[in-house]
């Protein structure tokens, strides 16, 4: 197994800039409208195409620089339930169904799963090769600002299962996300 390198942000395209602990020059990449704006279109194909370009640029960056292309920290699947949360623009809104479906399309575009031998993937199945891995953010209920790195954010079971976890389920089952970034909860 070859060495795998972590990635940078990718919520609305590949973030490939210097000064974040990486020793490479700034690299021009495509920057899309923030996910909250793209989700407002309800256009799943648009989201998939944005993910496709993000995945291609991440892989090209990995091939050229040798860093940060094997995975990207995206999409943000947190629910945008409080307008004071400073990262609402990274999410897809306050509806778990819309968020799950849109984020799954972005993942599918980024990862571009396929089989080494060229055979098609069975619908709903997994390929044996991906372009770049999607890492979901932030599992789960990470949408509070005050003391978010220190306090646990507790929710009722109904909110937990019907609201907060639902988009993550879509992303795991339909999008086949490769990883999950956790939040700070107990």
Over which residues does each language-model region extend?
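Glycoside hydrolase catalytic-domain context in secreted enzymes
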Residues: 1-186
């Amino acid at each position: 197994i070859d060495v795998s390198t972590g990635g940078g942000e990718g919520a609305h395209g590949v973030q490939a800039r210097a000064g974040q602990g990486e020793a490479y020059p700034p690299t021009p990449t495509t920057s899309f409208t923030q996910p909250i704006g793209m989700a407002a279109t309800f256009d799943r194909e648009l989201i998939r195409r944005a993910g496709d370009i993000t995945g291609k640029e991440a892989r090209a960056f990995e091939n050229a620089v040798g860093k940060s292309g094997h995975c990207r920290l995206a999409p943000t699947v947190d629910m945008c339930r409080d307008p004071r949360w400073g990262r609402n623009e990274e999410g897809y809104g306050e509806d778990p169904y819309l968020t799950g479906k849109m984020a799954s399309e972005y993942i599918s575009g980024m990862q571009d799963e396929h089989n080494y031998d060229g055979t098609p993937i069975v619908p709903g199945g997994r390929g044996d090769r991906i372009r770049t891995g999607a890492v979901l953010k932030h599992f789960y209920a990470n949408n509070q600002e005050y003391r978010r790195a220190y306090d646990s954010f507790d929710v009722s079971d109904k909110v937990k299962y019907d609201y907060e976890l639902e988009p993550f389920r879509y992303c795991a089952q339909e999008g086949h996300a490769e990883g999950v970034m956790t939040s700070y909860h107990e």
